Amino acid sequence: MLAFSALNIFNSPIKVRSNIKKLWFAVNQVMIESMGVSFLPVRAYANAHTYGVNGLPHIDDGKITAIYYPSPDWDPVWEGGTALYTEDGVDCLRYCTYKFNRLFMFPAPTIHRAMPVTRDCTRLRTVIVFKCNLDTEHPTYEKFYNDQ
């Protein structure tokens, strides 16, 4: 059984680092378009698990967590999405289905967890996570700050 794993992908070999930087640029463009402000990745890593390994509810550091679902052959019936919970951790507020090329963004202090995959799933549930803070040097920050 494979347990949760985390890999700091910004410290990976050059080719991987180049691809991750391209992915980050695309992720940040979506963040700018949807939230009106640029972010900086504080941490980035790949996370993966298989059937029988469940994520625990937790909160993240930083301002925003962005989770990218990279598996093109993922079947949504295998589940394995991400759930967000109320502040007391009792009720599920939102469930994001695992879907290829989806980006799920939410405030980092929100209680969340990776959901289990079904027994018939023989694939590795893999996500790429960016933990982000506001980019106070980016031109979008001043307008964002003044609008708050």
Model-identified regions with their sequence ranges:
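Non-heme Fe(II)/2-oxoglutarate
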Residues: 1-37, 147-148
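Catalytic core of non-heme Fe(II) oxygenases with the double-stranded beta-helix
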Residues: 25-147
